[in-house]
Curated annotation (Swiss-Prot):
Membrane keyword on record: no
Region (Basic motif) residue spans: 152-192
Biased composition (Polar residues): 127-139
Disruption phenotype: Leads to the loss of ochratoxin A (OTA) production and the down-regulation of the OTA biosynthetic genes. Produces greater lesions on grape berries and is more tolerant to oxidative stress.
Protein name: Transcription factor otaR1
Gene coding for it: otaR1
GO molecular function: DNA-binding transcription factor activity, RNA polymerase II-specific; RNA polymerase II cis-regulatory region sequence-specific DNA binding
Domain of life: Eukaryota
Subcellular location: Nucleus
GO biological process assignments: ochratoxin A biosynthetic process; regulation of DNA-templated transcription
Organism: Aspergillus niger (strain ATCC MYA-4892 / CBS 513.88 / FGSC A1513)
Main location, first listed in the record: nucleus
Swiss-Prot/TrEMBL keywords: DNA-binding, Nucleus, Transcription, Transcription regulation
Length: 221
């Protein structure tokens, strides 16, 4: 039903109401709530408002508004004499929360969306990280022990070989020293022998000179 048709029906229904106070309320006052809010203290006014609701066939004006539209047509409520604010009108026109139907696309997307879990809550990651962080397996321990034993044997063999090489080098040096000493002693012996031979030759030369002089004196006589 259009807003102008509702306003005309309200104006026609207001003629059936008796005169109250200084004057009868207009149709816009009834729609905007001035008549209901200004005279709610009187019991007679309450009964008259119930008669008006019976004539209209609806307890509130909000039932005449089509909520299927994107925006409700509230042009017929525009009255300069109204005292209700836009917030109150929105409260009168807005549908109840129970009537709001969630969109199937949004709910389906929210249900189908997987819930993200933190890395700490994932059992797969924790189980995958646990072997590397935990103790090593017996096979790896045996291999590590075997590698350690091989390294130890290699170092011991290398040290033994170095000791033997150092011993051979020291022995060779000692042999060379002994050989040099023997050669030195031999040279010393030969030197002494040569010196003795030279001394003998000098002695013989002196004897030969003396004999030659003796022969010369005899020949001169």
């Amino acid at each position: 039903m259009d807003g102008f048709e509702i306003a005309s029906e309200l104006l026609q229904a207001s003629h059936h109401l008796p005169v109250l106070g200084t004057g009868s309320p207009s149709g816009s006052d009834i729609i905007s709530g001035n008549y209901m809010l200004g005279y709610s203290a009187d019991d007679a006014n309450l009964s008259q408002f119930e008669q008006l609701e019976g004539l209209l066939g609806s307890p509130t004006v909000a039932n005449h508004v089509d909520f299927g539209k994107e925006t409700a047509d509230l042009a017929f409520l525009d009255d300069s004499g109204g005292i209700l604010s836009s917030v109150e009108l929105a409260g009168m026109v807005s549908p109840p929360l129970d009537a709001v139907v969630p969109m199937p696309g949004i709910t389906r997307a929210s249900r189908s969306r997987p819930a993200f879990s933190t890395p700490a809550s994932r059992p797969g990651l924790s189980s995958a990280k646990s072997p590397s962080l935990g103790a090593t397996s017996p096979g790896s321990m045996d291999r590590s022990e075997e590698v350690k034993q091989l390294r130890k044997k290699y170092h011991e063999k290398y040290k033994e070989r170095n000791r033997l090489a150092a011993g051979r080098s020291r022995q060779k040096q000692a042999d060379l020293i002994n050989l040099l000493q023997a050669e030195q002693q031999e040279e010393e012996r030969r030197r002494k022998a040569l010196e003795l031979e030279i001394a003998n030759m000098q002695k013989e030369l002196v004897d030969m000179k003396q004999e030659l002089q003796h022969h010369i004196r005899i020949s001169n006589c």
